[in-house]
Amino acid sequence: TKKTDFNVYGKVTYEFLRGLNAFVDLQYRHVGVKMEGPTDEINWDNNQRIVYNMDESFNFFNPKFGLNYDITPNHRVYASYAIAHKEPTRNNFENNINAELEMPKAERLNDLELGYKYQSKVFTAGAYFYWMNYKDQFVLTGEIDKIGEAITRNVDKSYRLGVEVEAALKPVDWFRWDVNAT
């Protein structure tokens, strides 16, 4: 298997008003995956090594936009929206070929986040809301492949929705206690 990966990334941050800034992250990513010839797997019906011949490429544009607002030196709110992609792994290709399924698709994530954070010298706390909407997400099927690895397959539509809460206490310089819950 041969995998090539190329990406270009840029980020811009602009302060509109004192304490209010916006950012834009942009990434272009190209991934190529090529598999040729026999593998280590055996077709036990004819005692021949299984041949995988495939050549796939993926072009991803992954933008992220957001706003940060420092209400006071101790209080901050933020909002962001991002699109991210993930290419299939070698295992995804091999397992789909073995099961005679269509080729796996790239995963696409639309991610919206809103948050609040309080910070002082001794105590920090934050609450963050997230909504992650997937297209063709890779999820575990509960199946195991021939060598004992967990199998994942594309699911057409799925989402994650939740709140994360975190806090930290640093009463002295040499000790910090962090807790979080999702």
Placement of each model-derived feature along the sequence:
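A short local structural element in Rossmann-fold oxidoreductases
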Residues: 90-91, 139, 176
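Structural signature of Gram-negative outer-membrane beta-barrels, strongest in the C-terminal barrel
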Residues: 2-133, 170-172
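Extracellular/periplasmic, surface-exposed regions of secreted and cell-surface proteins
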Residues: 11, 30, 138, 152-155, ...
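Generic preference for hydrophobic/aromatic residues in regular secondary structure cores
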Residues: 1, 35, 138, 152-153, ...
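Gram-negative outer-membrane beta-barrel transporters
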Residues: 18, 131-133, 153-182
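Surface-exposed, extracytoplasmic segments of Gram-negative outer-membrane nutrient-acquisition systems
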Residues: 134-154
